[in-house]
From Swiss-Prot:
Native organism: Pseudoalteromonas translucida (strain TAC 125)
Segments passing through the bilayer: none
Gene3D superfamilies: GroES chaperonin (2.30.33.40)
GO biological process, one term: chaperone cofactor-dependent protein refolding
Stated name of the protein: Co-chaperonin GroES
Primary location class: cytoplasm
GO cellular component: cytoplasm
Gene: groES
Quaternary structure and interacting proteins, as annotated: Heptamer of 7 subunits arranged in a ring. Interacts with the chaperonin GroEL.
Protein family according to the UniProt entry: Belongs to the GroES chaperonin family.
Amino acid sequence: MNIRPLHDRVIVKRLEEETKSAGGIVLTGSAAEKSTRGEVVAVGNGRILESGDVRALEVKAGDTVLFGSYVEKVEKIEGQEYLIMREDNILGIVG
């Protein structure tokens, strides 16, 4: 992928969600919720503070992250769906 997000934006590839319930039932269509877990594929240079300084982002390419269900932008790049969000939308880094 040949794209670099600006400022505090992060590009995330959504990871596939389990399609089976805890009881072993296969979920299809609207019953299977979209995953709120993904892999960071690119990050911007950081957030520009009021002082003009740049605060580096805490996430980096390769991190597995949890994010809120609202995503700023969904974009197809080279046939693959990516999520473009601000670092503030990321709730945590997994493991």
